[in-house]
């Protein structure tokens, strides 16, 4: 079997489908190289002194880990000079980062969560980098935050790298989902899973059960039915999985199916959810839909949500289509009887 690396895949994809212009291909290759560098830092861990808190906080009010800061800098420095981008936005930064005037500017916007699941770093659980690519609405003009305010359906590419027993890059450019495994001996991402599909039905759900008392009734109804097993209305037993790392949980779902839920809860009623729309929900929703799954906030398809601010939060329910549709139906029924 011939080995296809990321560069070859992107070139052949462009020839066949004309969906990856040269500037986008170069951008995706640079992001992949940055992920490779982050992977090396993650793998060294305590040997490189990169574990533990950085002693700072991000715009979300969360404590930054040392690797959060390192990963953010790696992505900024790798992507600022190539001429492919007009600006970048990161979960770790309050405002967007416009490409400095000393470098040429391109027609794309890059958004990323540099290290998702970073609270798991010190306990050696899989973590990852999530990214999303948008077109700059008016290339050549000064970038404003409004340029980033595009619904997820406007993404031209999205993906993540998961740093676990292997480092795997998962990518979509709107023509299916493909997985590439880092071959450390040659330093290349090699295509190992083509056209990944999520089964429509599942017997696994991923949710933080400790928050059950705070959920809205439709979510509690769904989980109660899953927990009832063969004796309940679903007529089958379910398993629960929860890693507390979105990249790891979604990677499992892309690999073998399941439903991931990070719903709204009543502790912070003024917030639509916990996860970030632009850096986490949109790219993951794009990947999941391209793999045949579904993604919703309980009421609306995530990819159709119109962003209003860079760090907007959202409830997230994604994975196997029939299960996501069921949760959406429960929300609809609750609204009708309210």
Curated annotation (Swiss-Prot):
Q: Which Pfam families match?
A: FBPase, FBPase_C
Q: Which residues does the record give as Mg(2+) 2 binding sites?
A: 113, 116, 280
- Indicate yes or no for the key word Cytoplasm: yes
Q: In which pathway does it act?
A: Carbohydrate biosynthesis; gluconeogenesis
Domain of life, per the record? Bacteria
User: Cofactors per UniProt?
Assistant: Mg(2+)
Which keywords belong to this entry? Carbohydrate metabolism, Cytoplasm, Hydrolase, Magnesium, Metal-binding
Catalytic activity as recorded in UniProt: beta-D-fructose 1,6-bisphosphate + H2O = beta-D-fructose 6-phosphate + phosphate
Concerning PANTHER family, the annotation shows: FRUCTOSE-1,6-BISPHOSPHATASE-RELATED, SEDOHEPTULOSE-1,7-BISPHOSPHATASE, CHLOROPLASTIC
Q: Which GO terms describe its biological process?
A: fructose 1,6-bisphosphate metabolic process; fructose 6-phosphate metabolic process; fructose metabolic process; gluconeogenesis; sucrose biosynthetic process
UniProt record similarity statement: Belongs to the FBPase class 1 family.
Recorded hits in SUPFAM superfamilies, A to Z, give: Carbohydrate phosphatase (SSF56655)
Report the EC code(s) recorded for this entry: 3.1.3.11
Gene name in the database record:
fbp1
Q: What class of enzyme is it?
A: hydrolase
Q: Under which name does UniProt file this protein?
A: Fructose-1,6-bisphosphatase class 1
The species this protein was found in: Ralstonia nicotianae (strain ATCC BAA-1114 / GMI1000)
**According to the record, how does the cofactor bind?**
Binds 2 magnesium ions per subunit.
Annotated coiled-coil segments of the chain: none
Q: Does the keyword Hydrolase apply?
A: yes
GO CC terms: cytosol
Which compartment or compartments is the protein found in? Cytoplasm
GO molecular function per UniProt: fructose 1,6-bisphosphate 1-phosphatase activity; magnesium ion binding
